Amino acid sequence: IFTIATIAVPVLTLNIMDAVMRFNLDKGVNHDEITKIGIVILLAAIIIGAVLIPISNGISSLSDLSLFIYFYCISSATSQIFLCDLRGKELLVQYSIGNILNTLLIAAFNIVFLLFFKWGIRGYLLAYSFANFIVSLYAFVVGKVYHSFFSKINKSKMNEMIKYSVVLIPNSFMWWIMNSSDHLMVTSMVGVAANGIYAISYKLPTLISTFTGIFNQAWSY
């Protein structure tokens, strides 16, 4: 489920988070204008995702989890866009704090939902969704995203940003193939249980990589 959701986010959002970061880095740019465009694309993704829920209900393996998957995808898209907004505005300390906060919240919510409430895959999805929404709120406040509500939509700039971000979607597919396609192969060959063990064993190196990646990305521009 997470493997599929990972690739759904850049497709639904047209990978606009990369454009938000890139165009905010330009000198003398109107940051509120760039952020507003990112929010507009996000709202469109939310609507399209809601329309797709009835379709996913027709897939037996997803029917019971469609709403949870939807909220996970939307929360992930929101947090990515707002965090990229912070990075584009060169609020690097706030960006790093947001990523660290996200990691800690995911761990905390997983402990509560999985160990105490025994909610299984629903708890796992909720843990990520809640963590992403909280981090989105944090980035919304420290990045002063609310200022963008009063700016007008620059259609030419929007087209420019979409042209930039859309061509990066294949790049997301390539990263997905490298990092996540193995989960589908493990599931198809030896079953879901084995894939669960494989996924858990991968968490520790991923966590370490996440912490180092946070600071590498924050200070790379």
Positions of predicted regions on the chain:
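C-terminal transmembrane helix end/exit motif
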Residues: 20, 81-88, 92, 114-115, ...
